[in-house]
Curated annotation (Swiss-Prot):
It is found in: Cytoplasm. This is Phenylalanine--tRNA ligase alpha subunit. It comes from Cutibacterium acnes (strain DSM 16379 / KPA171202). The lineage of its organism: Bacteria, Bacillati, Actinomycetota, Actinomycetes, Propionibacteriales. Belongs to the class-II aminoacyl-tRNA synthetase family. Phe-tRNA synthetase alpha subunit type 1 subfamily. One of its GO terms (biological process) is phenylalanyl-tRNA aminoacylation.
Amino acid sequence: MSGPNTNYDPVQVSALDADQVEARVAEALEAIARASTTAELKQVRITHTGDRSALALANREIGALPPAARKDAGKRIGQARGRVNQALKARQQELAEAELEARLAAETTDVTLPVVTSPQGAPHPITALIDNVCDVFTAMGWEVAEGPEAESEWFNFDALNLGTDHPARALQDTLWLDPVDDGKCMRTATSPVQIHTLLKQQPPVRIISPGKVFRADEYDATHLPVFHQVEGLCVDKGITMGHLKGTVDAFARAMFGAVRTRFRPHYFPFTEPSAEVDLECFVCHGASVGNPDRPCRTCRSEGWIEWGGCGVVNPRVLIACGIDTDVYSGFAFGMGIDRTVMFRNNAPDLRDFVEGDVRFSRSLRGGAR
């Protein structure tokens, strides 16, 4: 900075010359007007108002003037800097508003465009029903048990009182694993899970065992070589056929609502006495029986639909698991999950549930039960 100059001549300090100051202001205003972005305007601010700008240097030269001249020079420089700062502020607001509008325009969503959504997934109807069945029985205090799908001959047949001459052991009914002589097969029911449980757990036992089972069946509208079952087992003191009937009735109501059931005498090697469980036809409600004018394809005009099997556990099964039959008794039941889903949704063909046709799955998604 220059020292005080008592013989001050304004011409000698060019930075303080009025024309020079006006020229610097004009340059700054022109640069401000040319700035098209806030980033460019920031650079203009540094160039024309920063510490090394012409106006800043002129402001520092005021100290070199005699006291009498400092007031006019300070006023002139202050007014010049004020004009530049005011122009910077106005231009900053203009550019900021313009940039905001541009960003909003770029980010605007056209609400008239169709919504692009991802395909909605949902549990398979069979999986959903298995979960539903498990919820029903766990709410009653039962447990869910699982076991291997490939079983030994003893677990799948012998322990369940199916003798060596039972037709279920034949190649045309059971899927035996190579080598056949090893006595390994794909389980034909989930009953082996009950044997595994009884060998590991002493009564009282209350379990259900849902899962896949395998049969050498034809693949048609009512049969599948791989399908799903849920079996239940209750072993405790004083268990009777009455307990079985009450449990199966409660299960039927949970699945189908206020439906009538019928217990029809039958034979199963692992239960004695045994029964088939029938449900009153959901379509004709028995009105087609003996009425040729109103035939029902669902129940074949019989008024009832077969649902599953049940019975009091054969003492031989309990003895094979080391359970004292003088103290304990039990009941068992088994129903097809696939058939239950079929009944609940009035589906005519079991194959629709396993062929992976998305159109069929979507048709059930809204009203599948």
